[in-house]
Amino acid sequence: MSGWRRIYYTLLDLPLKLLVRSKVIPADPRAEAGLDPRQPMMYMLPYNSKADLLTLRMQCLKQGLPDPLTPLDIDGVTLPRYVFIHDGPRVLTWYAEKSQSVSLFHNYLDLHRSNPALDVQLVPVSVMFGRSPGRESQTSQPAPQLRLLNGIEKFFAVLWLGRDSFVRFSRPLSLRYMATEHGTDKSIAQKLARVARIHFARQRLVAAGPRLPVRQDLFNKLLASKAIEKAVEDEARSKKISVEKAQQNAIELMEEIAADFSYEAIRLSDRVLSWTWNRLYQGLHVRNAERVRQLAEEGHEIVYVPCHRSHMDYLLLSYVLYHQGLVPPHIAAGINLNFWPAGPIFRRLGAFFIRRTFKGNKLYSTIFREYLGELFTRGYSVEYFVEGGRSRTGRLLEPKTGTLTMTIQAMLRGGNRPITLVPIYVGYEHVMEVATYAKELRGAAKEKEGLWQMMRGLRKLRNLGQGYVNFGDPLPLATWLSQQVPQWRDSIDPIEAQRPSWLAPAVDEIAATLMVRINNAAAANAINLCSSVLLASRQRSLTRPHLLAQLACYFELLRNVPYAPDITVPDLTPEALLAHALAMNKFTVEHDTIGDIICLSRDQAVLMTYYRNNIQHLLILPSLVASIICGHPGIERAQLQQRITLLYPLLKAELFMRYSKQELSPVIDSLIAELARQGLVDAQETRLYPAQTRLHVLQLLAASVRETLQRYAITFSLLRANPQLNRGTLEKESRIMAQRLSVLHGINAPEFFDKAVFSTLVATLRAEEYISDTGDAIDEKVSEMCDILSELITPDVLGTIESASLLAHGPASAALPAD
């Protein structure tokens, strides 16, 4: 670099270092974007901007990547390490050389023709100062966030938006591959430049999103739609009001529903949330975000479908997506959050509000469906919670399918962009509403959201530990429907909302698939692992060595026989994990002369069931295997497989587990092999025995499934006692008996007698043909399950269930058989 050029860049670099604090996307470009600094590397930027180039240089030096200002010397030929795709205005037009991207590409390709060993990585990089998409009324102005700026505009962009800047590294393109597969002549270089322009245009759309509508223009367009016109006429006729009054009602509903997205609100909230997260959370862990970026760049309409743990979810997900270089979505939020001042703030951050029920209000349901369809048509990403509300137990709830149905109906309008559903697992080490959830499960009335409740909640925000956002396996709707409902395209109608016969069963299956994929991306952490161990112990307490041994067992199970490829397990030793958990002040440590005892008080144990339930599905099968082996020393493998095969459909329905019946057998074999490797099980030919040297670890693992089996025993006991029980009565009596059992045996889990759990169980009994179409129990199948369950439950609990069955339905012979 010449002396004058060095002075020029140095002078330009000084103010940039003061004004610019750019974020790198992805966070680790070497690992996540596949950049290898050992190979020759060339950077490709969209616009001729020295500010962009020097911002890129700052990040390259931080990330250990080659300096873009250092030329490449190849076979005695010196070439620039960067290229601008577009020429344009510069601060010093008399000084800066004209960009000649096609000529430079051709020179590089020519070097590859003469040197077969050469392979230069061409790395596309976008540098963004601000990401405002602009408003649709600004038709004469191109989107400002990545457009070509003159020197004065760029100066003010850096001055105002330097702290809201992003450097986005894309995966490199191998120029060796281009030269080998496509040749090295100038037409290939021209094609490469054209493809680069398309790539950067897509990235601009991914980063900023489509233009935002003027709200009144959006309302006018919705009012003009045929569906809403008809709904307005029906409203006027049914309520005996004028059409003008019905239209006014429609506009009021639109005002209630529609978001008022503001980029400035997003920027301000990012500052506030960055400050907040850094003080409340010890870390935010994001996995598989590259999947979503790839989908967005390929032009997919993305619908984010997270699990719902807390009111924090809304803010956390938008924050994470923004920092992953993606547009924060329009979020379906419950109408209960539309209170001052939260409602107006959420609305500007992209929230649109939805009532709990649409029943009896055709105008509302039509407007909501048309608004959702309009969001898809305009290309905005959308987020909704398919569970319909926050989980009070820590488990996934049965999905509510209304919004999902509307999503598929929007696709049946015949839009051009493919719609893809992205399941998201959200996990916390501390959920501020957990104590409230426990009260509600015990029968307390749900507190209404409002300013006072929000202020009380803010006071509780402290030491939230780690947060986890894991993006699951995406579900492309068109692909899924083509496989499951080949004739689905016959139902496409650009005008009317369609309800073909296949829609309801398809929606139910898609919803269940999404729940399974959310669980497939679960995050184990210090709190849910330690809670799982301590809650399995009889007195909710363990010595430190026993607790560490159990954590080591769980770590090895989750790492060596992972539940699913997308689950995450802490990269810590058991000792480090326990130290972190104790620092969260959720566990009590008692000291004596022998050593430490880690405990949970009775009240705290109730709250910790929430965190245990977050990952219960990860450990339930290993626990069931351990339980059967402990209860049947010397059991044949085939018998163990047979028992688990019978019990598994109940677990699968309750916990949204991923394995089909065909996949179950090899999974069980893998778990047995892992337990044997850990020295917990002694496998002798076809028989399985508990290993006496580590019996305590195996028994504690087995205890994790204890409460689940007790619940099943209650329901099957009632069925056996009275095969004619109808489903509603069976659910009710099961809950009553579960409450009795929890009092008599100190069961602290609020979900033990949760209505939804028994409702799912009874529905599964019908699906698995334990109950006939007429509602009667199938004696042989029920008796077989009763026999299996009676062998896995302790005599004291079994006695309580038997006595309760006697009181409810008479003969003792109808209850579970005693040991």
From Swiss-Prot:
One of its GO terms (molecular function) is glycerol-3-phosphate O-acyltransferase activity. Its EC number is 2.3.1.15. It is a peripheral membrane protein. One of its GO terms (biological process) is fatty acid metabolic process. Pathway: Phospholipid metabolism; CDP-diacylglycerol biosynthesis; CDP-diacylglycerol from sn-glycerol 3-phosphate: step 1/3. Pfam families: Acyltransferase, GPAT_C. Coiled coil: none annotated. The HXXXXD motif is essential for acyltransferase activity and may constitute the binding site for the phosphate moiety of the glycerol-3-phosphate. PANTHER family: DIHYDROXYACETONE PHOSPHATE ACYLTRANSFERASE (PTHR12563:SF17), GLYCEROL-3-PHOSPHATE ACYLTRANSFERASE (PTHR12563). The keyword Transferase applies. The keyword Cell inner membrane applies. This is Glycerol-3-phosphate acyltransferase. It catalyses: sn-glycerol 3-phosphate + an acyl-CoA = a 1-acyl-sn-glycero-3-phosphate + CoA. Keywords: Acyltransferase, Cell inner membrane, Cell membrane, Lipid biosynthesis, Lipid metabolism, Membrane, Phospholipid biosynthesis, Phospholipid metabolism, Transferase. One of its GO terms (cellular component) is plasma membrane.
